[in-house]
Amino acid sequence: MFKVSKSARPIDWTTKDYKDPLVVRQLKKDFHGKCYICEQKHFPNLNVEHFIPHLDDETLKLDWNNLYYACSRCNSIKNKYYDDLLDCCNEDHLVEEWIKVYYRMPDEDIEVINGCPNDHSYHPKAETSKELIIKCFNNANSGIQEVSKEDLRDKIIDVHSEFLDLRRE
């Protein structure tokens, strides 16, 4: 997770469609083209994700502050099952300090650490966020999840290799 400064609702958004190109383009800009959960860029299928599951509530479904930019993998894993997460758009939620993601070895699962103090009121949200991120990086419960996990892992390995090359220069 990374901190996001979300813009105001687009003035030109007049439809009742949260998948309106205007909405998607603004979300892409606000979230720097990255999935807010796994942080990958250039993913094949994007979703407009509802931070709080809308459960057919039209107000939540169209609430600009509830719309987030996500890859289809993370969105399908989060689905309606996670609703008590750290909010990367809330300046009080120190997502970059509290959630640490570690890549150890290519064949090992990604490790996620909850660094929010145990006595902090946001600790339960940080713990739920940690659990979701672990699933988003490591789940392989179906053929689709297995292949998308491999693709995500390959991207991590590529970025890690590029980083190591830069360090050598």
Give, region by region, the residue ranges found by the protein language model.
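Residues in flexible loops and secondary-structure boundaries
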Residues: 9, 35, 56-59, 107
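Short, charged/polar micro-motifs that form catalytic or ligand-binding hotspots
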Residues: 13, 17, 21-28, 57, ...
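N-terminal, Lys/Arg-enriched amphipathic/low-complexity engagement segments
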Residues: 1-44
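Extended charged
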Residues: 1-8, 21-24, 72, 76-169
